[in-house]
Amino acid sequence: MLAKRIIPCLDVRDGRVVKGINFEGLRDAGSILEQARFYNNELADELVFLDISASLESRRTTLEEVLKVSGEVFIPLTVGGGINSVERAREVFLHGADKVSVNTAAVKEPELISRIAEKYGSQAVVVAIDIKKVDGRYIVHTHSGKQPTAYEALEWALKVQELGAGEILLTSMDRDGTKEGYDNDSLALISTAVHIPVIASGGAGSLEHLYDGFTKGHADAALAASIFHFRQHSIREAKQYLRDRGITVRL
């Protein structure tokens, strides 16, 4: 059985790590480099760097920040925010990213997924899907969750898989920052329908929530921010907790 992954996420805005609730009310969560170094030494399996305002404000992810982070970590680094072309993806890879995460641009131009995958391989393409429950349906949103789309979550997940995505980063906007646990219903819906890895995101507030994301949501990886950024729990502690309960992790 493949080991389940624990992935801390650096939501970056104006050169700082931030964290909000339901994509709003951002508060400072520290220095980008300090957090990156910390997670590199904490047995994180990967690190995600998301410039959360890049697409919203139509500006590009700061390549200098990506370069600094990539020089500090020796674990796979996924970078997202404002990646709207193959050339932009190339720049991010040249600055040290191992994977790129596309979201808003992929909904606008789905073929972007295929073009990046054809050039760099599916393993280098993560499609971030932000969903919100609307009238009982999971609706995909873009522009940092500000704009609803015509896509339902399952429909879009199957489409991005077909287009060549190597992973799906599924974020519940309803749970984001709430520490109430992942939306395991939507996770299970997507995880059991696709054959590519699904990363759980949005709502982790305890070690039990990580466990539930793997066992109830059938996620392949768990992304978290609040519980790690503010040192509520360590990644080592989380992995030991999971291992003690029969989940295969790297320790």
Curated annotation (Swiss-Prot):
Q: Do you know which Pfam families this protein is assigned to?
A: His_biosynth
**Where in the sequence is the active site?**
D11, D130
Q: Subcellular location, in the record's words?
A: Cytoplasm
Q: In which pathway does it act?
A: Amino-acid biosynthesis; L-histidine biosynthesis; L-histidine from 5-phospho-alpha-D-ribose 1-diphosphate: step 5/9
Top-level EC class: lyase
Q: Which UniProt keywords apply?
A: Amino-acid biosynthesis, Cytoplasm, Histidine biosynthesis, Lyase
Its quaternary organisation is:
Heterodimer of HisH and HisF.
The identity of this protein, by name, is Imidazole glycerol phosphate synthase subunit HisF
